């Protein structure tokens, strides 16, 4: 049975059914072909090829095209000759394609007419002046000419000696000697189906010739396992050069089902692709790599791909390590019934070898499972063996996987005959437990990157062959970045070397970064010291200075340069046209990520939403998007920035119902309230600016992470004073650990500080709440501190003098910290009596009270885009309040008491709550619907803290946990005591500070690695505050408090003690610092303002 016979059998039953659909996703109607049309077109192509091709020896025909409606007909037409099809990817590096075609000794190639110019320009050396060409519909047939052919597989029957040598070499791969007399021969007329090459990154690229007998059992078995019928719609997710594409195409066309094809560029746009697959075409079967699925983002996966109403019956994930069960469960919407499979295989035994269906019971279980998903059972005709280092098959323990089967054999490189039952080494290591096989990882330095195997030594070899590189080494930094370290006499060749690597390496093997170093570090054994290289890279990213832009014109010129260098465009291209699109100019997903990285390095900050803009918009639109973030106009551009970013955060349009409500809310307060301009400081270094664009532009505090009127919802910058911009401190010595001496004396710092009481204000009882400092933009002298107490009092105190401006008695104790409204006219605070109070900020007069069903100790958070107030309650609910309309917009059950404070992230627009039941929840700020949740297993008193990439939170089990904004846990850092302290990030978002009940203050980097820790004299409950030394230096400091009443001032880079001051009572309040003054509450009933005096201020 051959692939084409499978299709003809199905076509005979379903002639008039749709076989193929091609949707360009450009607002034009999709194109459909019936089985009858596909078969007829294939027959015409077969006749054409038989007429014009003079086959001698092995029949192989290249196919150089992009995905389209005719693709299945073209493949089928080649197979019917009969011949094997050899896919050539037009976007692959020309040198790689040429090597592949030459090694195959490819004589004929069909080129899509749309790709003719690209083919001729990239491969002109293969075409003589008398090159034979002939056209057939949308194809052109070329006859290729090879000079000095290294490998010639057009063997005749007389080369027996050669064959015997091949048999001998193959038998060394542990072939059963009893079967040595039985072989598969690729010269047989109907033997081969297709020819591929391995990525070439696990060594020299291997040619893999796949017989029909090897691939057909895959198709037949999957049809049964997936229960494919004529009603199914399958998506062609894989490129032709990746062998799972064969399964996708022929699984559909051998079953009477329909195959959906879209342009490659659409696959790079997650929201658009999800809409096309599951809304427009109702795809029922999807085979994909985990990376492809992850591109959708957990929110879109849960709401669309794996929702309760999804069309998707079957999801088969393979090509990479299978996601953890925890992640998989977080992706599934409630009520989803999609069958999920783990498939595993290698190209050398094309295509898949094993399969495992994740049981519904396992998917629905709430029990935490740390075990990986098993590889499952062998597919039809496949033999799976696990062998130890001695080559013996094992039934228990760890070893390398070998794959094969009597007919499941392929021809590698210049093999002509292969013994049946040949077993191929995979390079994958597994463990066998109770008969089940679990994946461990790749052999030696082989890794999988972007779904493809990569041997990092190959990258080193290619780089070392470049004349400008004296020596080099490659590391897989933190298993996420490929870094090339180079020693070169010429420091200016970095860009040139990067271009050269792009020429000779496939895209997934191109390094993320090139780092120039003076010499390679070695171990005592004379080997490259990888750990030292990692330290060099850590210092490199911490210490590299920001690029400074001189203005808009400079940005445009540098963007043009990055565009040309990333796309490898000619240097003599004077100007990139304004309307140029990245994907149409030769870009792909990896290059887009590279361009994003280079732009963010150029501007010195992250640019939210930029990747989607790069993939879908012109260079001019990309420029404008960057401009709105990094070179904001004082008025107009900033407002544009707000609108643009808000639109990006709503890209999946899930908040449609909430949008009109928010608009009404904003209109209401705009009409009835005076809008003030001010800056707000609160615990954890949080800085928020509202309605004060002109003021902030002057300060240099424009942020990329927030809307136009928000400098930072999440620790973007700290104010040194209201007259000068902030400088960011970075750690130079990650291994430094500082602590108090046995006598309790502070360690010697570069410049000691002293703390003195400037003023204190009596509240009548303990102050556990943290201060809120509001700085009016146009009257800095009227800066006010708002804070509540267990005495039921809410106070407004003058920041500079400590004079009480007003005092309001509420109904019960106040532990909640205050929050300001968007207009600045109101202060919002929670109370033990279950009420949320809205007080007028200028008088303390009660404006509105909202009732919950239990105590409110949570502190409110305000959404600067809508003005909504979010707060949690001990009644186990989260609330969204419109204080202007005096109504509750939504109420969401959280599954546990909400003690900590919510955290709002703007892009993606998520609101985070944590419960004493151990749940961390991400909810939709517009509706209150849960987007994802994670059970930490222990109570969460700590408040979540957002930065541009991650969300961090402390747990009473002693761990600081870090998650992506899509709910995937990235890392956890363990301390020796419960964590009640909320984390605080540095202005650069490269470090995170927090305290623990083990009496230490910790500083970690964003990879979860300890930078330093400082031992205090008691437990640390409060949240630290990072700030700039007011003495005129560039020093970044950290203020923290321990429960015994000590206030600690540390140098943030190393954790070195600068000063300590002991208050007369316990401290559970968190400090806030402005200029040289620190505000904090104490259990001696007072709010304190401490003056921080440096050596030159005493």
UniProtKB/Swiss-Prot annotation:
One GO MF term, please?
ATP binding
UniProt-listed Enzyme Commission number(s): 6.2.1.-
Q: Which UniProt keywords apply?
A: ATP-binding, Fatty acid metabolism, Ligase, Lipid metabolism, Nucleotide-binding, Phosphopantetheine, Phosphoprotein
Positions where Phosphoserine occurs in the chain: 649, 724
Record bears the keyword Disulfide bond? no
Give the CDD domains listed for this entry: A_NRPS_acs4
Q: Would I find Lipid metabolism among this entry's keywords?
A: yes
Q: Which family is this protein grouped under?
A: Belongs to the ATP-dependent AMP-binding enzyme family.
State the protein's name.
Answer: Beta-alanine-activating enzyme
Organism equals Homo sapiens (Human)
């Amino acid at each position: 049975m051959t692939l084409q016979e499978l299709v003809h059998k199905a076509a005979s039953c379903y002639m008039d059914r749709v076989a193929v659909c091609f949707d360009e996703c450009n607002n034009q109607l999709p194109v459909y072909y019936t089985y009858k049309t596909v078969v007829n077109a294939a027959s015409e192509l077969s006749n054409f090829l038989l007429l014009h091709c003079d086959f001698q020896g092995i029949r192989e025909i290249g196919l150089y095209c992009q995905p389209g409606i005719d693709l299945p007909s073209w493949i089928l037409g080649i197979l019917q000759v009969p011949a094997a099809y050899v896919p050539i990817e037009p976007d692959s590096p020309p040198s790689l394609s040429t090597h592949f075609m030459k090694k195959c000794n490819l004589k004929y190639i069909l080129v899509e007419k749309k790709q003719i110019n690209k083919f001729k320009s990239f491969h002109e050396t293969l075409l003589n002046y008398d090159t034979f060409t002939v056209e057939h519909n949308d194809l052109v047939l070329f006859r290729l000419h090879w000079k000095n052919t290294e490998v010639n597989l057009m063997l005749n029957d007389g080369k027996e000696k050669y064959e015997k040598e091949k048999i001998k070499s193959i038998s060394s791969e542990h072939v059963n000697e009893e079967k040595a007399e039985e072989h598969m021969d690729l010269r047989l007329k109907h033997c081969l189906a297709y020819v591929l090459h391995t990525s070439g990154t696990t060594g020299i690229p291997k040619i893999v010739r796949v017989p029909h007998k090897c691939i057909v059992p895959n198709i037949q078995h999957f049809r049964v396992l997936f229960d494919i019928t004529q009603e199914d719609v399958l998506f062609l997710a894989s490129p032709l050069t990746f062998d799972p594409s064969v399964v996708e195409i022929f699984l559909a066309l051998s079953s009477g089902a329909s195959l959906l094809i879209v342009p490659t560029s659409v696959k790079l746009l997650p929201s658009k692709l999800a809409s096309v697959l599951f809304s427009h075409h109702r795809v029922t079967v999807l085979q994909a790599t985990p990376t492809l699925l992850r591109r959708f983002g957990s929110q879109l996966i849960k709401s669309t791909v794996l929702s309760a109403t999804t069309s998707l019956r079957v999801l088969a994930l393979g090509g990479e390590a299978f996601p953890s069960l925890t992640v998989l469960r977080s992706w599934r919407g409630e009520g989803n019934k999609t069958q999920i499979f783990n498939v595993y295989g290698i190209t050398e035994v094309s295509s898949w070898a094993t399969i495992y269906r994740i049981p519904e019971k396992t998917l629905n279980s709430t029990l935490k499972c740390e075990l990986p998903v098993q590889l499952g059972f062998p597919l039809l005709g496949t033999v799976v063996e696990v062998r130890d280092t001695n080559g013996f098959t094992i039934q228990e323990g760890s070893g390398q996987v070998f794959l094969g089967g009597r007919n499941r054999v392929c021809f590698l490189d210049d093999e002509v005959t292969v013994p049946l039952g040949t077993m191929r080494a995979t390079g994958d290591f597994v463990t066998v437990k109770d008969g089940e096989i679990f994946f461990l990882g790749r052999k030696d330095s082989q890794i999988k990157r972007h779904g493809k195997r990569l041997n990092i030594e190959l990258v080193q070899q290619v780089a070392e062959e470049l004349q400008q590189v004296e020596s080099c080494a490659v590391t897989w930094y933190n298993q996420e970045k490929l870094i090339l370290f180079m020693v070169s006499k010429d420091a200016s060749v970095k860009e040139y070397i990067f271009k050269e690597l792009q020429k000779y390496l496939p895209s997934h093997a191109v390094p993320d970064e090139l780092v120039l170093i003076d010499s390679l570090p070695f171990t005592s054994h004379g080997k490259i010291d990888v750990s030292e290289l990692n330290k060099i890279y850590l210092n490199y990213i911490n210490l590299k200075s920001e690029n400074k832009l001189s203005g808009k014109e400079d940005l445009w010129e540098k963007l043009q340069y990055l565009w040309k260098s990333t796309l490898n465009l000619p240097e003599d291209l004077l100007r990139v046209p304004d309307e140029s699109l990245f994907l149409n100019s030769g870009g792909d997903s990896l290059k887009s990520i590279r361009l994003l990285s280079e732009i963010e390095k150029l501007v010195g900050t992250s640019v939210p939403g930029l990747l989607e803009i790069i993939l879908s918009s012109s260079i001019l639109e990309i420029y404008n998007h960057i401009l709105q973030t990094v070179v904001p106009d004082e008025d107009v551009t900033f407002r544009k920035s707000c609108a643009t970013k808000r639109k990006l955060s709503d890209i999946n349009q899930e908040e449609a119902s909430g949008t009109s409500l928010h608009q009404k809310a904003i209109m209401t307060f705009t009409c009835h309230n005076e809008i003030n301009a001010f800056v707000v400081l609160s615990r954890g270094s949080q800085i928020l600016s509202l309605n004060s664009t002109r003021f902030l532009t002057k300060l240099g505090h424009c942020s990329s992470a927030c809307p136009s009127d928000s400098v930072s919802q999440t620790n973007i910058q700290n104010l040194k004073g209201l007259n000068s911009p902030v400088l960011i401190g970075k750690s130079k010595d990650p291994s430094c650990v500082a602590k108090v001496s046995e006598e309790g004396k502070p360690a010697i710092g570069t410049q000691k500080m002293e703390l003195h009481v400037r003023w204190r204000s009596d509240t009548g009882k303990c102050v556990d709440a943290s201060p809120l400092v509001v700085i009016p933009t146009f009257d800095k002298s009227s800066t006010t501190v708002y804070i509540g107490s267990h005495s039921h009092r809410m106070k407004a105190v003058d920041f500079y003098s400590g004079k009480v401006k007003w005092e309001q008695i509420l109904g019960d104790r106040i532990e909640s910290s205050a929050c300001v409204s968007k207009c600045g006219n109101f202060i919002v605070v929670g109370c033990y009596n279950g009420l949320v109070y809205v007080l007028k900020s200028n008088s303390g007069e009660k404006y509105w009270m909202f009732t919950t069903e239990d105590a409110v100790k949570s502190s409110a958070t305000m959404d600067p885009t809508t003005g909504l107030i979010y707060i949690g309650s001990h009644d186990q609910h989260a609330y969204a309040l419109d204080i202007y309309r005096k109504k509750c917009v939504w109420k969401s059950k959280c599954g546990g008491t909400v003690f900590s404070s919510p955290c709002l992230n703007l892009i993606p627009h998520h609101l985070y709550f944590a419960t004493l039941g151990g749940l961390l929840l991400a909810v939709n700020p517009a509706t209150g619907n849960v987007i994802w949740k994670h059970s930490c297993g222990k109570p969460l008193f700590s408040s979540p803290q957002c930065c541009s990439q991650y969300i961090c939170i402390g747990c009473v089990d002693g761990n600081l946990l870090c998650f992506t904004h899509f709910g995937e846990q990235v890392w956890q850092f363990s301390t020796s005591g419960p964590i009640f302290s909320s984390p605080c990030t540095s202005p650069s978002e490269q470090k995170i500070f927090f305290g623990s009940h083990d009496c230490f203050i910790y500083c970690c980097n964003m990879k979860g690695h300890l930078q330093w820790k400082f031992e205090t004299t008691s437990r640390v409950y409060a949240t630290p505050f990072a700030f700039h030394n007011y003495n005129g230096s560039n020093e970044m400091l950290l203020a923290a408090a321990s429960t015994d009443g000590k206030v600690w001032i540390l140098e943030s880079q190393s954790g070195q003690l600068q000063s300590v001051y002991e208050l007369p009572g316990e401290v559970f309040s968190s400090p806030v610092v402005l200029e040289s003054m620190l505000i904090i509450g104490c259990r001696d009933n007072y709010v304190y303002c401490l003056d921080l005096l440096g050596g030159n201020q005493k």
